[in-house]
């Protein structure tokens, strides 16, 4: 399981608890910058501050198979990502970073694995949607746009 752009880890915690990830033997890899330049759209998010990384890590302290990694995707993925992925959630709101994550991780997604693209259908992220749609089309995949504005791909 992988999430790129985990922010505070809320959705990852819900998935981890629902699946009882500790009992499955699976790992969960969470990535985020955890800090953003002043004036950007992300600086308006609640709880964004200098302790976000440590707070997010603490949220998963009881789950040793969950790794919270700080850095820029896709660079942080090198040597710090799983070989096989059953579930990939991408939520970085940045087209180049999301395409970089797909380039680095898509081949590791198992057949039948799920890829969720957050904000795929949200009108504020058309550049992201267009880039992802073209990327998947070039590989023979269609993105299903869900009513929640997420995109779903089953490999």
Positions of PLM-derived features:
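S-adenosylmethionine/decaboxylated-SAM
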Residues: 1-155
């Amino acid at each position: 399981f992988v999430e790129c752009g985990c922010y505070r880890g809320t959705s990852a915690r819900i998935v981890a608890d629902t699946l009882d990830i500790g009992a499955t033997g699976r790992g969960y890899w969470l990535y985020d910058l955890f800090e953003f330049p002043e004036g950007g759209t992300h600086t308006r998010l609640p709880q964004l501050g200098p302790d976000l990384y440590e707070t997010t890590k603490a949220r998963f302290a009881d789950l040793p198979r969950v790794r919270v990694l700080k850095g820029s995707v896709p660079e942080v993925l090198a040597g710090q990502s799983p070989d096989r992925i059953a579930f990939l959630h991408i939520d970085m709101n940045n087209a180049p970073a999301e395409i970089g994550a797909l380039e680095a991780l898509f081949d590791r997604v198992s057949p039948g694995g799920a890829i969720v693209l957050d904000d795929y259908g949200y009108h504020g992220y058309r550049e992201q949607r267009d880039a992802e749609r073209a990327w998947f089309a070039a590989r023979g995949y269609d993105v299903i746009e869900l009513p929640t504005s997420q995109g779903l791909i089953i490999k």
